[in-house]
Amino acid sequence: MNPEAMADVHTQGAFSMVELLLAADPVVKAVLIALVIASIWSWAVVTEKFFAIGGARKKAKEFEEAFWNGRADEYELRPGQSSNNAGAKLFAAISREWRDAKSVSPSEHAALVARAERSLRATVDREVGNVSNGIGALATIGSSSVYIGLFGTVWGIMNAFLNISAQEDTSLAVVGGPIAEALFATGLGLIAAIPAVIFYNKFSGDLNRYADMLDAFSQDLLVRLSRRASDGPI
């Protein structure tokens, strides 16, 4: 930062973070803008995933309850459906095997269950992948924002020493601006990184529980399918 510009800010008695950003060194300014964008991006991802993961788990649970209560026919279960209910998609993935289970011969029993298992596994992976799409940005922001802020800090401190050398003066008017820039970059880096790391860990746990729930329902479907193929209608 130009020391004269910083002095003008102080003399006007209207110092603020916005004015600090506008008067900052171009490199530090680029760092601060990048961190602001990263922070906004991370909160956008957090908001979207908060509703997406919660909604997906709720809908899958609703279908599972309907299935065990004998109301699965309330859902459209044809393969290739556009439903956003993961539970319904799991059942749709084995709907053909479910229909054929009543008439399958004993020699085809194992093959039918194996086909269903592969289809369910692929569907679970696809559904978890769809819901988790985007949370990698939180990991990137959480791991990189601190270092980006640190770069701005180093640059601001370097400018402070350069100003001391150029002005041959160690007064606050000379070093205050660059030091303020350095501290602001550090703080903004932490502001961007900390929420990103916290919510990345939270969503990772939520996704693991979501995947476990779908896996458990898949295994229940396989058991019911196997019994249906062996014993006829349940």
Please describe what each predicted stretch is.
Residues A24-G70, E74-E76:
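Transmembrane alpha-helix/interfacial motif
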Residues D25, W43, Y75-E76, F91, ...:
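Residue-level signature of catalytic and energy-coupling elements of molecular machines
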Residues V18-V31, S132-L138:
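Membrane-interface helix-boundary signature
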Residues I179-I198:
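Hydrophobic alpha-helical transmembrane segments of polytopic membrane proteins
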Residues M1-A24:
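Short, strongly hydrophobic alpha-helical membrane anchors
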Residues E168-A182:
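Hydrophobic alpha-helical transmembrane segments and adjacent short intramembrane/lumenal linkers
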Residues P3, R57-S171, I198-I234:
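Predominantly long cytosolic amphipathic alpha-helical stalk/bundle segments
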Residues V31-A34, A38-W41, S145-I148, G152-W155, ...:
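Residue-level signal for the membrane-embedded core of alpha-helical transmembrane segments
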